[in-house]
Amino acid sequence: MGRTLTDRARGYLTTFEDMTGAAVADCIVLDDRVVIVVDPGEMGAAIGPDGTHVQAVESAIDSTVKVVEGADDPARFVANALAPAAVEHVVVSTQGEVTVAYVEVAAADRGVAIGRDGRTIGLARTLAARHHDIDDVQLA
């Protein structure tokens, strides 16, 4: 799956970069939030001291913002997408045409990794497909 940005997502991406100084790799606009994927190593700039950068962007765009740190390594990327769940291990396996990321999380964080109505793991699946051609993310 490739990355196609809507005009609205492009606008939010530009606003986020301008307000935080962080390099943004992707932006997805959902019904209840905006998801920003920043380049590796850009989380500090994106969040800002005590979350001030994210809070300023949320006020400017009048929406909740979730920031995910990008990664060149598919396993690291999937773990980042499931944050704040404590991911213990990720194995990315390809069988035939299908690539699946199997994720082990701390037992206490299984609900966090799934999220309300499956939102967190659903977002991880979407991002993994957009950035690393991973077809599915499953909790092991």
Positions of PLM-derived features:
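Acidic, polar-rich N-terminal leader regions of halophilic archaeal proteins
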Residues: 1-140
